[in-house]
């Protein structure tokens, strides 16, 4: 079975969502189904149909999270010794060689990615181009507008 990398923060976030789904959402859906059943005829009961749809979503998400957590390899970026190289969990400061703009990204797992917060998916084109690079190296990324070149300015593990 293949493991999937996830940061300690990402694993905690998934565990919190799972707890919420099991302790709040699931009981709420069960109550909604019971209330809809009490209305009588289920063949044309929109409340019942909506509650059953919601139950399907909640149960599906619970299974999805449990599956991901069962194969997750939890990595604490603060404990990573990448030897100065860009690895999973590393925070990387980059300079666009064309524009001179600087950006900072942390390389995280699929469920944690949020570009607005500077969190990029390990399987994204830019993360794949950065893995193994060191400060001073240049990474080339295929973008819709053509190849972009970024210099690795700093690498940290936090």
Swiss-Prot record:
PROSITE patterns registered for this protein in UniProt: GREAB_1
HAMAP family in the cross-refs: GreA_GreB (MF_00105)
Keywords: DNA-binding, Transcription, Transcription regulation
Pfam families: GreA_GreB, GreA_GreB_N
Signal sequence residues: none
Any single biological process term in GO: regulation of DNA-templated transcription elongation
Taxonomy, superkingdom: Bacteria
Family: Belongs to the GreA/GreB family.
GO MF annotation terms: DNA binding; RNA polymerase binding
Protein name: Transcription elongation factor GreA
Source organism: Verminephrobacter eiseniae (strain EF01-2)
Physiological role: Necessary for efficient RNA polymerase transcription elongation past template-encoded arresting sites. The arresting sites in DNA have the property of trapping a certain fraction of elongating RNA polymerases that pass through, resulting in locked ternary complexes. Cleavage of the nascent transcript by cleavage factors such as GreA or GreB allows the resumption of elongation from the new 3'terminus. GreA releases sequences of 2 to 3 nucleotides.
């Amino acid at each position: 079975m293949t493991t999937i990398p996830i940061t300690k923060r990402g694993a905690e976030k998934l565990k919190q969502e799972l707890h919420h789904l099991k302790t709040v959402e699931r009981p709420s859906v069960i109550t909604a189904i019971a209330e809809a059943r009490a209305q009588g005829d289920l063949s044309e009961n929109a409340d019942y149909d909506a509650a059953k749809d919601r139950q399907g979503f909640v149960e599906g998400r619970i299974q999805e999270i449990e599956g991901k957590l069962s194969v997750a390899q939890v990595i604490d970026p603060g404990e990573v010794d990448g030897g100065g190289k860009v690895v999973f969990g590393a925070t990387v400061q980059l300079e666009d060689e064309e524009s001179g703009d600087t950006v900072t990204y942390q390389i995280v797992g699929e469920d944690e990615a949020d570009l607005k917060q500077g969190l990029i998916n390990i399987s994204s084109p830019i993360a794949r181009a950065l893995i193994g690079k060191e400060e001073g190296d240049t990474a080339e990324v295929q973008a819709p507008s053509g190849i972009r070149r970024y210099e690795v300015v700093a690498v940290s593990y936090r």
